[in-house]
Amino acid sequence: MYITINRDILSNIKTFSKRFLVILLINLFLILNAMSASSASIISDKTGLPLPRFVSLKGNKVNLRRGPSLDYKIDWVYQRKHLPVMIVSEFGHWRKVTDFEGYTGWIYKDLLSGSRYIIVKKEETLLRNKAGFDSLGKAILKREVIGKLINCEGLWCFIRIKNMRGYVLAEHIWGISEAK
């Protein structure tokens, strides 16, 4: 009788363990699948490029329109060459963009450049010699200063502003994806 009870208990434990392991694996698969779907970019069927993506304005005068055509009203005229914008959608030769203040509209694709620029979104941030909080500062950058993005690694991005190069905290700038 004692051996039978132990076998029954052992059999129940094995059955429970198998079920628990299957449920655990299914949940792990669902969580990983959801995480990869949320972080993945959509690939545009028009250009083959990811959406959303960052680009910059080619010229000093670029119209932001309500829709993807010259027939639509101009809502805003940008007058800042290299201003970074994020392409969120595409329609023919038009790109729906959002700027760092959240304004959205349509810009003709030839007025955009694939060159990557950033804009300072904090009131002030320090341009540093090296990537690190203990590094010496080279300059204080004010809000809306535009710089050329060279690369990002971890918390820091290496940028160029006129003839200065240095590191700035990624969270203080706009024009980079969260994944960088």
Which role does the model predict for each range below?
Residues 37-66, 77-81, 88-129, 137-145, ...:
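SH3-family beta-barrel domains
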Residues 73-75:
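Non-catalytic, beta-strand-enriched accessory regions in extracellular/secretory proteins
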Residues 1-16:
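N-terminal secretory signal peptides that target proteins for export/translocation
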Residues 69:
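Second-shell loop/turn segments in exported
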Residues 23-33:
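Bacterial N-terminal signal peptides
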